[in-house]
Amino acid sequence: MINKKRLLLSTVSIMVISGWNQASAAVESQDSLVVTASRFKQPISSILAPYTVVTRDEIDRWQSNSVADILRRLPGVDIARHGGIGQLSSLFIRGTHASHVLVLMDGIRLNQAGISGSSDLSQIPVSLVQKIEYIRGPRSAVYGSDAIGGVINIITTREKLGTSLNVGIGSHGYQTYDGATQQTLAENTVLTAAANYTYTKGYDVVADGNTGGFRQPDRDGFMSKMLWLGVDQKFNEQVSGFVRAYGYNNRTSYDADINWSYPYARPDTRELYSRHYDMGVRFNQGIYSSQLITSYSHTKDYNFDPQYGRYDKSASLNDSEQYNLQWGNTFQLYQGIVSTGVDFQKQSIEAGTSYIPKSKTVRNTGMYLTAQQQLKDFILEGAIRSDKHSEAGWNTTWQASLGWEFIKDYRLIASYGTAFKAPTLSQMYGFGGNHDLKPEESKQWEGGIEGVTGQLTWRMTVYRNEIEQLIDYANSRYYNIGKAKIKGVEWTGLIDTGMFQHQLTIQYIDPRNSETNEILVRRAKQQVKYQLDWQLYDFDWGLTYQYLGRRYDKDFSTSPAKRVKLGGVSFWDLTVSYPVTSYLTIRARIANLLDKDYETVYGYRIPGREYYLTGSYNF
């Protein structure tokens, strides 16, 4: 965690040997090389911003069956869920809006975020996730629009040769079947293939009908099918490349929305079809490395009444295509690294998407420069980026950080950064659209101290985020009329005591509307997260505790919607696994152990106590 002497020199050595790779999750060494913070490979210990990595082994140990269940355990994260698996989930980082979180898949932003403004994590199959890199704080100076609260990078590439088969069952008719293999086709060629099918009957997610929709006392289930295929090729010692494709088809049932235009229909079914293709080439020689990636994704998102079908006039369709081109270069310079590159993105939507009457295309070109240097006991880090958005014009953001190891194993950190979010297509051209909207802008100050005290590795951070020109809906149109001010403090710690490993996060945020001084909705001011792991007689046990403080929401069953308070809650999860043989492992989980009844979105129930059983065979 703490910077050591010559840390950045070792970073450079590792990078030069391994090659810089933004989108590939190549085999990581024990010093946990990551790429998301500054778009070049570096050990976590050299990163000044708060950073968390979740590995596939941890996901298996937690036995998470959704991406939301993985992320809710992480520092600074708050999840507002409209029910169980597959139901809409909103991700808040450090109290910022869900649209202020940049979600990447293998370093490339998700397709639908440019339309709705935020990424719907509920639709990403958890079997697709092999690693998650998560950084808190502004990162627009590295990635451009959306990265106000933080960045989530979901990495899909598998890291281990071999084959794995998984079968699971659980409450509410849950079942999942998963298979993956990674094999060497030739000396320098590796093929990876994976598939998954997941289904749950679900449960009735609406608690009391207080959602402004129609009460439907039925099960709200979910089904997902996923395929992944990739090839990695090493051409020589300097050049390598990859090509991959993956896609998933999902079907989700929910309680009906009101369709004012076609009152005969009750849209309560969602079908999502997502396809993604990308390829890249990497070059590495001496102090220089480079990577070029191109990608294409296509998403179709239907909402309809099954009685009339998805092609009925009462149905809706969000149909979007996205093209990306990324070129990044990294240089060893003095006692550190400099990275520079260009991103290009083109997003096209068909007429009718998000109620936009005509097809639209937007383009964004970004140029960035990041650098990190070590000067004795100091680490200096900086980044600057300019984006040219075809609708929002030019936006330039920057950030700077300083770390000082004032005594051995203790470091002080200070940082400042700016960030922005461009208006979405629906805000500019949909119902109530305003093509004169300006980007939302933020300024964040952060200070922290981290250290190793005996067996305890810890960090405490305080931050302040001011966001202006927030886009809000008023008088039947979108305007830049909102402001928010967020203050927070978080403490994270990790310690081993005998056979027990403890991880603890304590966080407090004060997210307020600067105009009204009201607490922003669906954010808990206090959270405590605790993970306890231990091994006893070959059984691996895990106990998870989470406390969510009270939060506010809106009751949309009234007009105008009134503000309501949701109570706080504490809940536990228990997991256990046992290696029957060196190939076969059996895992079991009890989620919401004490069967707590609570809501993170007003009117939508979180599942009660649930049971899961999984078998994994690896060879």
From Swiss-Prot:
Domain TBDR plug span(s) in chain numbering: 43-157
Residue ranges crossing the lipid bilayer per the database entry: 163-170, 174-183, 189-200, 222-232, 237-253, 270-284, 286-303, 316-332, 335-344, 360-376, 378-388, 392-407, 410-424, 441-450, 456-465, 478-495, 499-514, 522-534, 540-556, 563-577, 590-601, 607-619
Ion transport keyword on record: yes
Motif TonB box per record, residues: 31-38
Record: residues binding Ca(2+) 2: D218, D220, Y254, D255, D268
Family indicated by similarity: Belongs to the TonB-dependent receptor family. BtuB (TC 1.B.14.3.1) subfamily.
Official protein name in the record: Vitamin B12 transporter BtuB
Organism of origin: Photorhabdus laumondii subsp. laumondii (strain DSM 15139 / CIP 105565 / TT01) (Photorhabdus luminescens subsp. laumondii)
